[in-house]
UniProtKB/Swiss-Prot annotation:
Gene for this chain: fluC1
The keyword Ion transport appears for this protein: yes
UniProt keyword list: Cell membrane, Ion channel, Ion transport, Membrane, Metal-binding, Sodium, Transmembrane, Transmembrane helix, Transport
Keyword Phosphoprotein annotated: no
Cellular component, GO, one term: plasma membrane
Reactions accelerated catalytically: fluoride(in) = fluoride(out)
Entry membrane topology: Multi-pass membrane protein
Documented activity regulation: Na(+) is not transported, but it plays an essential structural role and its presence is essential for fluoride channel function.
GO molecular function: fluoride channel activity; fluoride transmembrane transporter activity; metal ion binding
Primary site of residence: membrane
Function, as annotated: Fluoride-specific ion channel. Important for reducing fluoride concentration in the cell, thus reducing its toxicity.
UniProt name for this protein: Fluoride-specific ion channel FluC 1
Species of origin: Bacillus subtilis (strain 168)
Length: 118
């Protein structure tokens, strides 16, 4: 049951990431950073922070939502690809900014989500 739940949660998270990332990217065309995935990763970190702060006792629910949904909603691999693409295009300043915004923004968002549930 838990494995099926992770599968379903992951599918939903991935579909939401795909849709939201594309919507944000379309609305921010012309900007020098990949804002779609940046936003998705920060929102995912915030959501996971809130969920983690709730201290859900049911291990299956934690796996389905934490590992399944939020694991698929956020994406370190796409962040990595986009960073390398910026570097290969010799857009070093943008790549550094993207790295800093993604890492610091995600950590801060997780912390905010976690602390508001305390």
């Amino acid at each position: 049951m838990t494995l099926a739940g992770i599968f379903i949660g992951g599918g939903l998270g991935a579909m939401l990431r795909f849709w939201l990332g594309n919507v944000i990217t379309a609305k921010t065309k012309g900007l020098s950073l990949p804002i779609g995935i940046l936003t998705v990763n920060i929102l995912g970190a915030l959501g996971l922070g809130i969920f983690t702060g709730l201290h859900v006792a049911n291990a299956s629910v934690s796996l389905i939502i934490g590992t399944g949904f939020f694991g698929a909603f956020t994406t370190f691999s796409t962040f990595s690809v986009e960073t390398i693409q910026l570097l290969m295009a010799k857009r070093v300043k943008e790549s550094i900014l993207y790295i800093v915004l993604t890492l610091c923004g995600s950590l801060f968002a997780f912390w905010c989500g976690w602390t508001i549930t305390i």
